[in-house]
Amino acid sequence: MKYYSYFPGCSSCRGTGVALGLSTQAITDALELELIELDDWNCCGSTPYVSTDELGSLCIAARNLALAEKTGLDLVTPCTCCYTTLNRANSLLWQYADLKNNVDECLAAAGLEYKGGVRVRHLFEVIYSDVGLKFIESKVINPLSGLRVAAYYGCQLVRPECSFDDPRNPKSLDCLIASLGAEPITFPLKDRCCGSSLVIPELDLALDLIHQLLDSAASHDAQCIVTVCPLCQTNLDAYQDMVKRKFKTRYSLPVLFFTQLIGLALGVEPKALALDKAIVSAQTLLSQFTKVAEPVI
């Protein structure tokens, strides 16, 4: 069993990305991962908040880092936005002494300190690097044979630097998909932005970006899209009908989390994977891959 401090994040805990949180919980035992939820965690600092109050965002992020440092474990999150915000804060506090001094004052007011000893990691990287594809392959009871999948990395997972993949041409998610028996299709826009929170102030612009992604996946014969980010999943799933109306498209592409795809291949109950939470249903597409693993006695 591998142990980690776990930061669920607001979205995957009780927001639009709740299916990510539920499916994460559903696969950890099979992958021999022990995710110990960080006690008294707060919002990561939020990527939009960074642009309006950088110091405030850093202080919020640093509080989580200080709490995680007490555990002595790597801090793991399933949310790409949380991963980016926490990782960025960690990096800035290492690089800029003046900034760290200001943050230290905020932490001291809460009776905390951060020495800089936490390694922030995305759950996908933990599964890819620490669990490993060979181990995952050995656990597959539902090979996803014939399922054509567009691997969507989004714009944050492997940027600006990445220790486990090529930021210019990532392939790790494609490799994971292949290890589950599915077919990763060619997807030229695999690392393009989904529109992020632009759906609020600039909906038309965001819909254009979402349309480009969906159109690229559909034109390369994808049957579904798999992502590592709750914001990407929300945009591609929740706004797909709006894209249909605006651009007169006909495709209907389910958008799944990588944790859901893993769980399906490992024989986890579809209900436990929260497959019913999506707006674009994957039920018909995935009905052939629902053999459930026998309980271990």
What are these regions (language model features)?
Residues 1-297:
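Iron-sulfur cluster-binding electron-transfer modules in prokaryotic oxidoreductases
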